[in-house]
Structure formats: structure tokens, C-alpha cells
Amino acid sequence: MVADELKEVVVPPEEATFWLDRWGYWCNAHGRFQHKKIIDYFHAAIARDEKGYFVGQVNGDCREKVYFRYEDTALFVFDVLLDDRPTLVLNTRQHIPLDPDALFIHNDYLYMRQDGHLIKFNERSMLKISALFEHDGDTCLITIGGERKAIRDRDAAASSEDGERHSNP
């Protein structure tokens, strides 16, 4: 059957029985998922369309899309490949180049924006990428290929712009 001919079953986020917590763990009413194969499958099945992020699969003659809730973002950096040009390994298994100009800090966490996606570094990836960091007073710098760049602190920038602290990255 051609993919365009598949019947589509859509579950809205308010009816989904699972979600991503702010650390990138899949959860349901009983707590965090425990089975690695299921966790990996869910992460690899994340996609996005105009309605938001969903976990998708083809099951027989149906394309299933379950839009899910997430506490912070749906995309996380799970690993960093430290080469001349570092590569980020996302929870979806996608590999993307690190863009130092797209990095920012918010609430003591490192994020990167790419193509309209907000990507958060989890604790493991933060530890790994910290080998590239330097601190110069209040500024966090990242060195890639001999070039040092300042990482924006979104909280400080927002605070200096309008006197308010913003909670959403």
C-alpha cells in the first residue's frame, strides 16, 4: 500500500497517555518508562508537523500519530561526538552539527535552536561538551576549531532588556 493511501489515526496530546519530562525521559501515569527498547523506539519515532510533535508509526494499513505533551522540549542532545566539528546526537538518533552561534543558556541548562526546533542538552551531553567550555568572569565560552565564542545567557539578556526574567526558552 502506498503511504499516501494509508488511513490516518490521530491522537491529540490531551488524550495521549505518555509524555516527555523536562529531562528527556518518557513517562506515563506509572512513572518513567523502564524498557530501553520501548524508550529507544519512541525517541526514534518522534516527528513534527504543523500541529506539533508526535510519535508516529505505520501499523498495517494505518498511519498512527500520537501528539504528546512535553515539559520543556521534545528534542534532546543525548551525546556529543567531539571531533574537529562537534556533532550532536539527538534523542531521535539524528546527527546534527553543533552550531555555536545557536547555543544559549537558560535556567542553567544549555540549549540550541535549529530550523525552528528547540534542542536541550541532557546532563550526560552537558558533561561531555563541557570539555569545550571556558569561563571568563560571568561569560561562558565555547572553543571549536581554535575559535572562541561566547554563549548567550538568555536569562541575563532578557533581564537586561526589559527587567523581567522569562521562563520559556
Task: Tell me the role of every PLM-derived stretch.
Residues 1-169:
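Terminal leader/tail segments of proteins
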